[in-house]
Amino acid sequence: DKEAVDWWIRRCQEWKEKYPVVLPKHYEAGDDEPANVYAAIKEISKRVEEDQITVVGNGSACVVGGHAYEMKKGQRFISNSAIASMGYDLPAAIGAWVADHTKDIILVTGDGSIQMNLQELQTIVHHHMGIKIFLINNGGYHSIRQTQKTHFHEPLVGIGVDSHDLSFPSMEKLAW
């Protein structure tokens, strides 16, 4: 019944305005952040066209992407939320491009997740795939870092720069 559906849509819009997922404080940059991930995701989403596909990775890309990405008509937002299989995102973006390469595919990933399939960057180059990669470089495995800090405190182990026992390639050097 159209009237009931319209009522429900209005009700959901009221709740969305009354209880926003992203608050103004989320857009405030922290002292230790070179960029604000919420602001970056929102800005990326503003520039993505209708009917375009965006793939997000794990951790910050998935959580913040799910909160701050503003969808437009016909867009697809592909994530593996709650599955947490790191490295899913780059092959998923390649698969999305193979399925529909009429428009560029947008990929938002983290420096930890992209390392699981870093070699696939060559696949993108070799096949001239239209995949635009936005990388959240937070110095390692951020979700693991947060879990360790919240539940176990110090010492941090196996997370990247902060733990001093794991290194990552220079993402700046890999960018083209």
Residue ranges and their predicted role:
Residues 1-10:
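Terminal amphipathic helices with adjacent charged low-complexity linkers/tails
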Residues 7-8, 15, 97, 176:
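A residue-identity detector for tryptophan
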Residues 13-96:
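Active-site diphosphate/adenylate-binding microenvironment
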Residues 1-2, 64, 69-176:
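Thiamine diphosphate
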